[in-house]
């Protein structure tokens, strides 16, 4: 009797897990894209899109600068601002920032150029010092969620 009950419970559990997996596979994620006004809404040569919106969350690809100066940092954050505005968002909607730089000391020194865009409402942030970015001459890249 115990064996029959165990087999029945096992069968029901397997059936439930199988159906849950099938349902998850049929659940299409609706994505909206924006890529600098590009008609395809993506860069097919590099294989990325600047902004992907899933439900009410924006995933913003990195914007880069060739120099870690107040001017370079400002250009990066202006590009990110344009990316956010493509879906009606601002820096006050940003919850996570990932910053990659080949010159961390300069980034720390000129951080005020970055902070002005957040207007005192800062996101969770991770800053990483790296030896190189995708664009060989880039020294700063910032991505947002």
Identify the meaning behind each predicted range:
Residues 1-2:
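N-terminal hydrophobic targeting signals that begin at the initiator methionine
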Residues 9-19:
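Bacterial N-terminal signal peptides
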